[in-house]
């Protein structure tokens, strides 16, 4: 969404059940016997012609295991997402998906990109008992401030969410050029202790693998009991 649509034909949403992105993910999941997460421009029936930016998780059997619509839509220069995407619905905005992986069950949240800047998102998922958040991301240079590198800020904010909410967070980001935007990659996985377990370079694609111990979430929240000592009576 690096340019404004000039006509409805510039918008190319897809059906979430059988569109090309999900079809690709289903094939990849079955062929490799893994879960595959993708994000796509979901087609919905709306009077304004907008769709949703939706994260989808496909199981190894090729079936859709989870999906979540992006809540927050940026209006920053060069990222014309509000011309394509509607805000995600406010009913059940933070769905938690229980996914069986090997011998463990993981409580998974699937917020998207701009959602990762908002502490309320990670906090709500943390309070609901999420173990892992996966933020599919497309962030890079700022066209109106090309000298400003936001990558360190992006990384710091997400790692901070992991610490404050006792979460594992995977933040895959694209790389390469599109229009005026240079996407700065740097995908990473962080743990509740604020450690970056693995990280990709800025300028090339990479496959990241990390082993996570879900018990570390409770270890961290026992050491720093943020949830137990909250004061929601003072927050409104």
Regions found by a protein language model. Give the residues of each.
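Active-site catalytic loop in hydrolytic enzyme cores
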Residues: 14-17, 23, 27, 45-132, ...
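Short, conserved active-site loops that position catalytic residues or coordinate cofactors/metal ions
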Residues: 1-13, 136-138
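Short beta->alpha transition motifs characteristic of CBS
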Residues: 2-3, 56, 67-74, 188, ...
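Histidine/acidic-residue-rich catalytic or RNA/ligand-binding cores of hydrolases
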Residues: 4-5, 145-149, 179-187
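Short beta-strand scaffold segments in enzyme catalytic cores
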Residues: 38-40, 53-57, 95-97, 187-189, ...
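Catalytic phosphate-donor-binding core of small-molecule kinases
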Residues: 152-160, 165-168
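C-terminal beta-strand edge segments of enzyme domains
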Residues: 88, 168-236
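A short, hydrophobic beta-strand-centered structural micro-motif
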Residues: 16-43, 163-174
């Amino acid at each position: 969404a690096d340019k404004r649509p000039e006509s409805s034909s510039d918008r190319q949403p897809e059906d979430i059940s059988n569109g090309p992105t999900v079809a690709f993910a289903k094939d990849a999941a079955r062929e490799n016997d893994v879960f595959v997460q993708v994000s796509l421009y979901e087609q919905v029936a709306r009077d304004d012609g907008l769709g949703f930016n939706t994260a989808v998780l496909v199981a190894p059997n090729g079936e859709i295991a989870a999906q979540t619509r992006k809540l927050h839509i940026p209006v920053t220069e060069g990222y014309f997402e509000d011309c394509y995407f509607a805000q995600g619905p406010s009913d059940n905005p933070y769905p938690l998906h229980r996914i069986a992986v090997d011998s463990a069950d993981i409580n998974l949240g699937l917020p998207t990109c701009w959602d990762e800047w908002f502490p309320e998102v990670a906090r709500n998922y943390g309070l609901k008992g999420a173990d892992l958040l996966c933020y599919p991301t497309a962030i890079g240079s700022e066209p109106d401030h090309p000298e400003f590198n936001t990558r360190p800020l992006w990384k710091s904010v997400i790692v901070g969410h992991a610490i404050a909410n006792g979460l594992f967070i995977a933040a895959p980001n694209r790389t390469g050029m599109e229009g005026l935007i240079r996407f700065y990659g740097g995908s990473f996985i962080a743990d509740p202790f604020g450690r970056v377990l693995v990280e990709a370079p800025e300028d090339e694609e990479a496959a990241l693998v990390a082993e996570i111990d879900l018990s570390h979430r409770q270890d961290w929240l026992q050491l720093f009991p943020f949830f137990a000592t909250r004061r929601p009576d003072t927050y409104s």
